[in-house]
Structure formats: C-alpha cells, structure tokens
C-alpha cells in the first residue's frame, strides 16, 4: 500500500489568508513562523508591530494571545478561554475571514478546522463542546416537553404514553428518549423503556440516546439503556462512540460499564483517534491508565500516523509519556511526516520528556546487551586470554636476543662493502656510511633493512631499532658540525689520537677488572667488535696515503667521544700528553710512522674493548627494562583479574536480583490471574441472573402466561390479571361447612363451600374466616380459597402463571414462608412475589412517597413509604377495622329494640353499615342535631319485608374508628395512629408525608371520612403545616390495582422468586427478595 504524505509547504507557496497579509505589511517571523520568507520582520525594538494596519487590527482584536503572537504579548492578558479558542468577537470574526488556521502560526486556535500544514495538523474539540441540547418550549410537543422537563405526574405521563407514539421525532430528529436521557429524567426513561420504545434512533447529529446520556454524564439513564440492549458502538457524525465521550469526560465507571456491555475499545473516530489516543490527546492521565490496564492497543495510529507516545510528546505531558514508557512501547516509530517522538520533543523544547526518552533508550540498550551476553563465560574467556598473553611474552624474549646478534653481523658486512666502493674518496666513505645507516631507519620502529643477505621482510624488535637510530643521528649531526675543522691545517690528529689511546687504555683496564663475567657471557658481540676494529684499521691506512683529508680519524674519534653524553657510547678520555706537545715534521718522519702504527693498534684495541663494554651495558639495561615491563604487566594483569572477579560478583548479584524480580512478577501475575478468574465467575453469575430474568420476562410478557394478582383481604379476596384496570373476581374470604351431615341430601352436598356460594347458603352453614386481623390462622381453609380462585373464579392453571400475592404489614415470617411453600409445592407456580398491601396502594395514586392509612375488614395499618420503600420502624398496626363495626352496630340497634343474633342476621347488619352509615365532621354537634330532629333518620327494609328506622346509629357506628373507647378499647383512633407514624419518620420527609396522606381499604369508604381525617390531623400537626388527604374513589380495590401496575413493569421482572431459586434456597428465599 502506498501512502501519500502531504509535506510541509514552503513559505512562499502558502496561500495568503485573504487580505490580512497585505494589511499587516510584512510578517513577523516569530508570530507567523510559516510565513517567515515573506520579508523582514515588522517588529521594532519595543517588541510590537510598527505597521499602522497591524496596530489597527490589534486594537480591534482586543487583547492578544501570547501563545499565537509571542512578539505582541505585552498587550495584556491572553484572550484564550477554557475551550482553547479566543472569546473576543473580533477574534472570531477574524477567524471566519481567515478560513482555517495554521496550527504553527496560531497554536491556540487549532480547533478551527483541519490545518493546511499537512501531517503537522491537529484536531478540534467541537464534537465535545456543548453536550446538552438547546431546547425551546415552542419547538416541542406535549410528550417531548414532558420528557425534557420530567415534572409531569406519573399517571398523566402513563396516559400520555398510551395515546401517542413514543418514537415520534421533533424538528431536530430527537425522540422523547433522547431528551429524557440528556436531561437525566430517569423515571421518564423507565416508562419509555417499559413501553418498548426504539433504542438506537439517531438525532440530527447521528447520536443515540445512550450517547447523549454518556455525553451529559447521566449515569443512571445510561445504565438503564445498556441493560435494555442499546448498542454502545454506534458512531455519531464525528465518528465518536459512547466510549470516546466517557473517556473525554474522565468517567472511569461509565467506561468500565461500557466495556462490560461490549463497547469496542479500539473504535476510531473520523480523526483516527481511538479512546486511548483521545485520552492522551486530551491529557486525561487517569483514564489513559485505566485503558492501558484494559489492554488497549498502544501502537494504534491516528490519521497522521502518530502513536500514543508521539501525541503525548506533542501535548507536552511528561506524566503520560512516563506512563507509556513503562509499557515498553516502541519509541522509534515515525508518523507520516517521518518524525519520531524524540524529534518532536526536541523541536518543542520539552527537556523533561527528552530526558525520559534518553533514559528509556539507555535502559533498553543495557537490557539488550545483558540478554545477548553471558557474564560467566566472558569472565572465563578474559582469564584465558590473559594467561596466554603472559606465556607468549615470556617465549618471545630469547628470539629477540638472537635477532640482535644477527643484526650486528649484517651491519659489519655492510660497512666493508661501503669501504670498497669509496676508496678514492675518504670523505664520501664516511658520508655514505653515515647516511646509509640513517636512511635505513624505518617508520614502523623496527631495525632498518640493510643490503645484505637478510630478507627484506625481516623485522626486528623496537628497543634495538631505537638505540641504533639514536647512534646514527648523533654521528650524522657531529659530522656536519666538524667538517670545517677537518680541512684546517692547524689540526694535529696524531696528538689527539695518542691522548685518546692512553685514556682508553686506562679505562679499559678498569672495565676489565670490574666486568670479567659480562665479557664471557657475550662471545658473539666480541666477534662483531673484531670486525669493527678491522674497519677502523682500514680507515687509518687510507689516511696515511691522503694529504687533504687528514682530519678523518680525529672526526671519527671525537664523534665517538661526543656521543657518550646521551646514549652510553665511549666516554670522553683525558690524554696524558699536553695539548701543546708537537712532533717534528721532517727529521723524525720514520720514527713517527712506526710510533703511529703502534699507537693506532693500541687505539683500535682500546676502542674495540670500549665498544664491547658499552654494548654489554646497553643489553643489561634492556634486560632490566624487559623485566620491569613484565612485572608491570603482571601487576596490571592481577589488577584486571581482580576487577573481572569483582565484575563477576556484581553480575551474579544482579542476576540474583533479576531472578527475584522475575519471581515477584510471576507471583503478581498469578494473583492477577486469580483475580481475573474470580471476576469471570462473578460475571458468569450475573449472566445467569440475567438469563433467569429474561426467562421470567418472556414468561410474564406472553399473553398466555399473564401474571396473576391476588389481594388476600381479611373480609374480601380480589383476583385478576396484571395489566387490567379492575379485578375479575371479588368474593368474600369465607369458608362454610354444613352444620349437620345429611341436611342437604339429594342436593349433591359438599364438604365445604367458598365465597359467594357459602354466603348464599349461610343459613345452613357454619361460616369461618381463615384470616383474622390480616393474619392467616387456618391454612387449610386459605388453601381452599386459593384453589377456588384459580380453578373456579379465574379458570387458569397456577403452574403456568407467575403469581403476585399481597399481605398485611408486619406479617410474621413463618406465615410468609408457609405462603411461599404452598404456592411452589401445592400449586407448582413457576414464580411468585409477595408485596406489602400499602405499597401498591400508593402506586395507584401515582406516587412513590407518602403515608398510606389502609383500613380493611380485619386490621388497620399506617405505613410511611419513601421512594417506593416502606419504613418498618414507623409502621403502626391497629386491630380495629370493618369487622368490629357490625358487632357494635348490632349492639346499638338493640337499644332501639331490634335484635340481630345469628350469623345470617349479622350479614344483614353489615349491609346496613355499608349503605346507611357515614362519618360525622363534628360528632357532638351531630348528636345534638339527631336528638332535636328526625332529619337524620333513614329506613331499611329487611329480607322478610319488615322496615326498620336508623337514626344516630348511622354516624355512631363509624365514630368508633376515631374513638375506640366506644368498643371498650384503650387504643388510639385511626387519626392519632396516622399522626404517630408520621412523627416516627425522619424529619426530612415529614412534610412530604403530611401532604401525601392516602386512604385505602373498604373501611375508608364511609362518606365524610376524608374531611374528618383532614380536621383531626390538622389539629395534631404543627399550625403552619399543610395537610392533604387523598381519597381515591376506587380505594376499595386500590391494593389490587397497584399490584397490577407493579407486575406490569419491566424493571419488576428481576424481582420474581423463581422455582429454581426456591429449590436451591427453600422458603426462606422470600425474606431476601421480598422486602
């Protein structure tokens, strides 16, 4: 694949941003780095632009941004807001005129659009600006307005959802779910999800309701949408998914939830940014660390080919760079412009980041070198090399000595050949001899090659070459200085030669006495000396026959003497002959000739001996130097060996530390693996629970398996299907048995009768209520009532339907367990739930907070409820309800002369109570009115045709609810019990309870009950407290209606007790799942 890369354009080719450049005169290369070739900077010594057009522009722009205009920062405080853009309207106007900004010339304004500088561009944050909707009320219909504001009563919202399309869109293509999710109205979101609204609808910016909930940080709404299956990977028009917005908001919990529900951690937006790259670009260190732990791809590239490390360097975040380097990230990767992270750090002058990258690179090199080498093997090889080198130096010493002897022999042969060639010219002989020796010195520090039988490629030791070279240089220098003296006539060579011979003989004697052993040790050197003696004698013979070059022997002798000072040659000698001594020239010529010959011989012998002595000393010094050198090398080798041993021990310690770290890392990885396994197990359990909930949901949502709702009252039993507005079956909770066997012969007599059938035959049956004061006392009869409900009233099979039962508050735990056992073991229901009667009653009124005064046939309860949860510590129970009132009415009717004694007659009195009785607002005043007139009297016709008159008994009967002393009870009335429950509740919710007092149950159906409760509670409550009594018209069935609503909610499906859970945990499961 070939990738085209836009290189950075030259300054001359950059398009002038409209007419701004001509107005500004010449560009400032500091403020506008991309245009620095356009001319000389127009910045004066004061650091400001001199051009009048620039000053005019500056005055219009307000205050300069010192990042975008570094030369103009003296104008005032930067005008860059938190969004990274200029707030000044003039700046925005200028920005619109210039089109898209150059991120190099205007670094703070890079959010305006794509940069024209190619691969060096940057990204804008417009996708993340202003997350909430801009809503105008006139643009929304009734449903959308209710979803946005969320202040509509629940019952009105339910009615609204029934009448309208929940997926309807407004002008901005927003559904009610979009608006409710963006504004955090979780209750509206619940209702919309219960109505099966569409989840993945897109608004005008292609955003789902889940994206808006995450973008606006409404976590509760977002979690509900995820639980109902909203796709978290749908991108908006910017390519951002929900995970991008969670990372931008630094919401780690939401990001974790999104990943659990399948969000793609490697999804890219239109800029090529994954959530990790976005977190790095926005310098969100905590979420970057979180994504790294979640195994996000550290080598992902944006559209410019930049990795997370390069983005972190460009942003100047040293902490994120350090965090990424801990993950062994590749620091050498290049973006599309060919630049690495280090190059960006250097160009941006991020010195701390440069140091971090350098340290990381050094650590990597050390790590690679340590992996490729074995310190123990290197130590062994070093020791072996040292030992072999020492052996080689010891073996090479004898070879050097033997080479020295051969060199001396070759040098003598070379002198003889030179003498034969230059016999006609004495001066040329010495010159050629000296120059020949000097020219033979090589550049490599070895003994020079001579014209002899020795091979040309033969090399000699360094120390011999240095000594020989030094002697030759001294001879050459002395020859050049003394040549004028040789040609002078006043020289007397015989006298100097004689003095020199005497001194040499004396020194030779002393040297022979002091060094006898050395001469015996160097036989080869003596032979070489004899050859040199012959050479000198030949030179003297040539001197005798020459008249012009008489000074040659003197020069040779003096040259040898002068060389002693520095190189250990023949030392200077003192002649015993006076300097002024002279010899006759003509008379004693023969005598002088013989004497000269003797003196010459003696001189040659002494010179030979001196030369041998000097060479012996030179060899001894060389041997001493070799020994010292060997000793120093041995000491160095010992020191090196110690250093190597120390390094070896250090490496072993480091290896031990590395092994310890490796073991620690293995242990930590095992712990993490164990934790991951535990997390997997917990996730599996959650998945199992979700599968159970889904199964129950499918079970309850099927029309053939609708939920059965049964309200078990002390006097009446109400039963029906969830979702209905009223119960389908209402019958008395009584069981009748024949008083005598055989009384109903021939009529298919049964052992027991239930409900209305038992009530119709009450004359010959013994009637019993299986519930007393809200508590089941006869389980056999209660089981008969449930059997009659399923098979006779509703005509359904209980094993095919989930069942919701109600119970009175503060019911004993044993009764709840027995109820659960009968439902699962006797009727084999697939699922069940037990609800407290007061909670469904409050749901019927459209509230989740309030106090319910529930008075039925057997018991009265006052239950404070907050946010759908009953408060047990403030719940009160009063054993005074509708069943005691017929007995009291029978008693006060006896005062008028009407006697009702049998069970059948008691049912007649119950009917009188329900049809004629009412609650007086002022009992004393009503009694006075009844005594003074007959206006309150009513007539009632008995079954036998007799008509009776009822007077003050009409309001005296229900008055017992407010004054239990009429019945001989010492308890409080229903109004005082309600007030006491409110006072037992928390102070913070008492106001809500006073204004939301709900009446429920058949006993509260008396006319005037609500007004009397209002009056009595207002007298007890604080004077400034507002009291509101809510008396629904169908409150006789409000418990059942609330249970029908509760069982229809989708959120309720997870609360069922399944048959599998009952088999695993037994009847006690009801206490954990039913509160």
Curated annotation (Swiss-Prot):
Keywords (A to Z) from UniProt: ANK repeat, Coiled coil, Repeat
Coiled coil: 399-435, 642-698
InterPro entries: Actin (IPR004000), Actin/actin-like_CS (IPR020902), Actin_CS (IPR004001), Ankyrin_rpt (IPR002110), Ankyrin_rpt-contain_sf (IPR036770), ATPase_NBD (IPR043129), CC144C-like_CC_dom (IPR039497)
Biased composition (Basic and acidic residues): 377-392, 401-424, 466-483, 495-530
Residues in ANK repeats: 172-201, 205-234, 238-267, 271-300, 304-333
Chain spans, region Disordered: 369-530, 544-599
A biological process from GO: substantia nigra development
Annotated Pfam families: Actin, Ank_2, CCDC144C
Gene Ontology molecular-function annotations: protein kinase binding; structural constituent of postsynaptic actin cytoskeleton
GO CC annotations on file: actin cytoskeleton; actin filament; axon; blood microparticle; cytoplasm; extracellular exosome; extracellular space; membrane
Feature: compositional bias, Polar residues: 485-494
Region (Actin-like): 702-1075
Membrane-crossing residue ranges in chain numbering: none
PROSITE patterns: ACTINS_2, ACTINS_ACT_LIKE, ANK_REP_REGION, ANK_REPEAT
Family, as annotated: In the N-terminal section; belongs to the POTE family. In the C-terminal section; belongs to the actin family.
Protein name: POTE ankyrin domain family member E
Organism: Homo sapiens (Human)
């Amino acid at each position: 694949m070939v990738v085209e890369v836009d290189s950075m354009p030259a300054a001359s080719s950059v398009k002038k941003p409209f007419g701004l450049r001509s107005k500004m005169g010449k560009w400032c290369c500091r403020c506008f780095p991309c245009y620095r070739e356009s001319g000389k900077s127009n910045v004066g010594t004061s650091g400001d632009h001199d051009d009048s057009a620039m000053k005019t522009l500056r005055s219009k722009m307000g205050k300069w941004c010192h990042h975008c205009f570094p030369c103009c920062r003296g104008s005032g405080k930067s005008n860059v807001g938190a969004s990274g853009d200029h707030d000044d309207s003039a700046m925005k106007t200028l920005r619109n005129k210039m089109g898209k900004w150059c991120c190099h010339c205007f670094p703070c304004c890079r959010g305006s659009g794509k940069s024209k500088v190619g691969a060096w561009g940057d990204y804008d944050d417009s996708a993340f600006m202003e997350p909430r909707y801009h809503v105008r009320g006139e643009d929304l219909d009734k449903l959308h307005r209710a979803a946005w504001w969320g202040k509509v009563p629940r019952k009105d919202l339910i009615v609204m959802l029934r009448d309208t399309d929940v997926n309807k869109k407004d002008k901005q293509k927003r559904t009610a779910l979009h608006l409710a999710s963006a504004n955090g109205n979780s209750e509206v979101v619940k209702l919309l999800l219960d109505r099966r609204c569409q989840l993945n609808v897109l608004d005008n910016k292609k955003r789902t309701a889940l994206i808006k909930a995450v973008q606006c940080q409404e976590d509760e709404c977002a979690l509900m949408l995820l639980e109902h299956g909203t796709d978290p990977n749908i991108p908006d028009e910017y390519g951002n998914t929900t995970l991008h917005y969670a990372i931008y908001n630094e919401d780690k919990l939401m990001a974790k939830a999104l990943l659990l529900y399948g969000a793609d951690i490697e999804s890219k937006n239109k800029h090529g940014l994954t959530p990790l790259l976005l977190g790095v670009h926005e310098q969100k260190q905590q979420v970057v660390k979180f994504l790294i732990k979640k195994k996000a791809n550290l080598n992902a590239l944006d559209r410019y080919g930049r990795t997370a490390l390069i983005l972190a360097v460009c942003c100047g975040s040293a902490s994120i760079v350090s965090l990424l380097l801990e993950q062994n990230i590749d620091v050498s990767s290049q973006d599309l412009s060919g630049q690495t992270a280090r190059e960006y750090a250097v160009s941006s002058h991020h010195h701390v980041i440069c140091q971090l990258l350098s340290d990381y690179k050094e650590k990597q090199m050390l790590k690679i070198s340590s992996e490729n080498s074995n310190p123990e093997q290197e130590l062994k090889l070093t020791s072996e090399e040292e030992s072999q080198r020492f052996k080689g130096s010891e073996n090479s010493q004898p070879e050097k000595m033997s080479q020295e002897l051969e060199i001396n022999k070759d040098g003598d042969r070379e002198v003889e050949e030179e003498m034969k060639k230059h016999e006609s010219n004495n001066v040329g002989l010495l010159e050629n001899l000296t120059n020949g020796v000097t020219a033979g010195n090589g550049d490599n520090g070895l003994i020079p090659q001579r014209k002899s039988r020795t091979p040309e490629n033969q090399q000699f030791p360094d120390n011999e070459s240095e000594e020989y070279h030094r002697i030759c240089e001294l001879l050459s220098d002395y020859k050049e200085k003394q040549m004028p003296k040789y040609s002078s006539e006043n020289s007397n060579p015989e006298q100097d030669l004689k003095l020199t011979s005497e001194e040499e003989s004396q020194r030779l004697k002393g040297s022979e006495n002091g060094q006898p052993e050395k001469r015996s040790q160097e036989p080869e050197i003596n032979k070489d000396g004899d050859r040199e003696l012959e050479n000198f004698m030949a030179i003297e013979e040539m001197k005798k026959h020459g008249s012009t070059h008489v000074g040659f022997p003197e020069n040779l002798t003096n040259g040898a003497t002068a060389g002693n000072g520095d190189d250990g040659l023949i030392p200077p000698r003192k002649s015993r002959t006076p300097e002024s001594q002279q010899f006759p020239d003509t008379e004693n010529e023969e005598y002088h000739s013989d004497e000269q010959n003797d003196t010459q011989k003696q001189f040659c012998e002494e010179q030979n001996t001196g030369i041998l002595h000097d060479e012996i000393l030179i060899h001894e010094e060389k041997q001493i130097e070799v020994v010292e050198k060997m000793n120093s090398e041995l000491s160095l080798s010992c020191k090196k060996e110690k250093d190597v041993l120390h390094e070896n021990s250090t490496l072993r310690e480091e290896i031990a530390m590395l092994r310890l770290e490796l073991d620690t890392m293995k242990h930590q990885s095992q712990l993490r693996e164990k934790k991951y396994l535990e997390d997997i197990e917990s996730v599996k359990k959650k998945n199992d629970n979700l599968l159970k909930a889904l199964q129950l949901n499918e079970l309850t949502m099927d029309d053939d398996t609708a939920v059965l709702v049964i309200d078990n009252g002390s006097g009446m039993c109400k039963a029906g299907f969830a979702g209905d507005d009223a119960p389908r079956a209402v019958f008395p909770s009584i069981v009748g048995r024949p008083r005598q066997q055989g009384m109903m012969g021939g009529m298919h007599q049964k052992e027991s009768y239930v409900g209305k059938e038992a009530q119709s035959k009450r004359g010959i049956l013994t009637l019993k209520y299986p519930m007393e004061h809200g508590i089941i006392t006869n389980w056999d009869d209660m089981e008969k009532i449930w059997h009659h409900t399923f098979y006779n009233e509703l005509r359904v099979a209980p094993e095919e339907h989930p069942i919701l039962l109600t119970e009175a508050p503060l019911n004993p735990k044993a009764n709840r367990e027995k109820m659960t056992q009968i439902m699962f073991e006797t009727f084999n229901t697939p699922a069940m739930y037990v609800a407290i009667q007061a909670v469904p009653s409050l749901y019927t009124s459209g509230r989740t907070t309030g106090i319910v005064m529930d008075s039925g046939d057997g018991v009265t309860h006052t239950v404070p409820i907050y946010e759908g949860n009953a408060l047990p510590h403030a719940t009160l129970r009063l054993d005074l309800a509708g069943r005691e009132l017929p007995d009291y009415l029978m008693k006060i009717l006896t005062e008028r002369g009407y006697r009702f004694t049998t069970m059948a007659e008691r049912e007649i009195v119950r009917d009188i109570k329900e049809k004629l009785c009412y609650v007086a607002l002022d009992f004393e005043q009503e009694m006075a009115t009844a005594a003074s007139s007959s206006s309150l009297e009513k007539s009632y016709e008995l079954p036998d045709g007799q008509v009776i008159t009822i007077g003050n008994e009409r309001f005296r009967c229900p008055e017992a609810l407010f004054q239990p002393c009429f019945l001989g009870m010492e308890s409080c009335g229903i109004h005082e019990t309600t007030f006491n429950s409110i006072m037992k509740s928390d102070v913070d919710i008492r106001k809500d309870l006073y204004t939301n007092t709900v009446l429920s149950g058949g006993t509260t159906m008396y006319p005037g009950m609500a007004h009397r409760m209002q009056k009595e509670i207002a007298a007890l409550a604080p004077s400034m407290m507002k009291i509101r009594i809510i008396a629904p018209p169908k409150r006789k069935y409000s418990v059942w209606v609330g249970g029908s609503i509760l069982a229809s909610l989708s959120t309720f499906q997870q609360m069922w007790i399944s048959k599998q859970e009952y088999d695993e945990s037994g009847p006690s499961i009801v206490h954990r799942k039913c509160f």
